[in-house]
UniProtKB/Swiss-Prot annotation:
Homodimer. It is an enzyme of class 3 (hydrolase). Belongs to the PRA-CH family. This is Phosphoribosyl-AMP cyclohydrolase. Its cofactor is Mg(2+); Zn(2+). PANTHER family: HISTIDINE BIOSYNTHESIS BIFUNCTIONAL PROTEIN (PTHR42945), HISTIDINE BIOSYNTHESIS BIFUNCTIONAL PROTEIN HIS7 (PTHR42945:SF1). One of its GO terms (molecular function) is magnesium ion binding. Pathway: Amino-acid biosynthesis; L-histidine biosynthesis; L-histidine from 5-phospho-alpha-D-ribose 1-diphosphate: step 3/9. Catalyzes the hydrolysis of the adenine ring of phosphoribosyl-AMP. It comes from Cenarchaeum symbiosum (strain A).
Amino acid sequence: MEKKIDEIDFEKAGGIVPVIVQDNNTHEVLTLAYSNRESLELTRKTGLSWFWSRSRSKLWQKGEESGNTQQVKKILVDCDQDALIYLVEPSGPACHTGERNCFHHSLL
């Protein structure tokens, strides 16, 4: 069932929702980011991953500086309509450190 952007609950977390980014082919979790309404609209319009930077308080496109873009193939919405999954085809590493994903440290 396709959802509309108006159905996403951006207000629960102050105008943003968490976005889990997964590789479309392997389903490996690549990163966790945040989206506001505008970045979600840009993602749907361009087919590339756009997010809201909480630390810089601005929109950013994944790969705009590094070239490691993410082609978004599907966007999933959770049952509470307050979290998203982007299924992507990455053109390079997801992490700014150069690692394939941002989850390369273990606690257990």
